Amino acid sequence: MDYRRFQSQAQLACYTNERDAIREYDATTPITTNLMGTFKDLDYFEWAKEMDVVSWDNYPGMDTPPSFTAMCHDLMRGIGGNKPFMLMEQTPNQQNWFPFCKVKQPGEVRKLSWQAVAHGADTVRFFQMKQSLGGCERFHGAVIAHDGTEESRVFKETAALGEELDRIGRRIMGSRIESRVAIMFDWQSYWSLEGCVGPTTGFNYPNEVHRFYRALWRRNVPVDMIRQHHASCAAQPV
C-alpha cells in the first residue's frame, strides 16, 4: 500500500511540475492530461484536484459491456466533482494493441460518442486524425486512413457525427447530471483488495463495482461515482 501511494503521488508530482512550467507562460488556458478509466496505478481522485478539467481515453474492447463504458464515463465525471469532462481520445475505427483489433461497425462510433455526451462529456475527440506512417500506430484507426482521401466509410461517418454534434451539442454543453444514487469507487480499497493474500487472487475490483452499477444501468438509473468520505453524499438517498 505504501508503494502504491508513493507511485501515484510521484507520477502526480511529475504532472504538476510540467503543469507549473506551462503556467509560467500561460496563466489562463486549461491544463489536463489523459486519464484511463479504472486504471489501477493512479488514484484519479487525487489527480483531478490538480487538473483544470478531467479528460480520458475511451478504448473499449470488443467484449466490453456498454454498461462498463458508461461506468467509466461516470467515474471520470465523479472524480471531477460532477463537472463536465472531456472525451480526449477514442478511435473512429480499430485499436492497435488488443488481442483482437476489430473494425468498428457502421454507426458504432456514433453510439459511443453520444454515450459519452449522455454521461457528461463536453467534448468528443479522436486519436488519430491522420493514420501514422510508422510505428505500431500505423495499425491504429484514424479519421483519414492511409489512402489519404475523404471517401472511406470512417471519414464520412466521422464528418457526419461532427455536424450532428455541432448542431445539437451547443444546446447541452456545460449541463450537469443529477443523480439520486451514488456508488463508491476508492483506489485505496482497489489496491488493498487486489493486493491482499486471500480470500482469492481472482478478485477484480472494477468488475465487482460494475456488478452493482450494471443493475442500475439496466434500469436507466443515473449514478454518481464518489470517493470515500465524499462531502456531498447526503445529496443521494441511496
Regions found by a protein language model. Give the residues of each.
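Conserved, well-ordered alpha-helix/loop/beta-strand core segments that scaffold catalytic motifs
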Residues: 5-35
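Carbohydrate-binding surfaces of carbohydrate-active enzymes
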Residues: 28, 37, 48, 52, ...
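Conserved N-terminal glycine/acidic-rich loop preference
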Residues: 1, 8-15, 40-53
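Short glycine/proline- and acidic residue-enriched helix-loop micro-motifs
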Residues: 1-6, 144-148
